[in-house]
Amino acid sequence: MKITYKTNVLDVIRLVENNAPELWKKEWNNFPNTWGGVNALTKKVVKDLLVMINLPYSKELAGFIRYIVEYPNTIRYSEYKRSLIGKTIEDVIFD
C-alpha cells in the first residue's frame, strides 16, 4: 500500500501497531536496559517505521509515530485513536 498525506490515519496506525513489536524485539539486545537505552531503542524503532511509511520526515510525523509506539495499551491512546476516525495524515500532522 502506498502511503501519502491523504491516506487514512488509521491505516498508518495499523501499520505501526503491527510492525513496532517486531522491530522492538529485533533491536532489544542491541541497547542497554537503562532509561537512555530504552529511549535510544524507541528512537531507532521510530526511524525504522518512518522509513517503512516512506513519507518526508517531519518532527510532527515522528512525534505521532513515537506516541503510538510508546503508549499502545492505554485508555488515553484508545480515546485518541477513536478521535482520528475519518481523518487523513495531513489532518492530524498539520492541525
Q: Language-model segments: what does each one mean?
A:
Residues 2-4, 36:
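Short Lys/Arg-rich cationic patches that frequently serve as NLS/NoLS or arginine-rich RNA/DNA-binding motifs
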Residues 4-5, 56:
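Generic extreme N-terminus detector
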Residues 5, 9-12, 49, 85-88:
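Generic short amphipathic/hydrophobic targeting helices enriched at N-termini
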Residues 5-25:
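Short terminal alpha-helical segments
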Residues 22-87:
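Acidic, low-complexity, intrinsically disordered interaction modules
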Residues 93-95:
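Short acidic DE-rich linear segments
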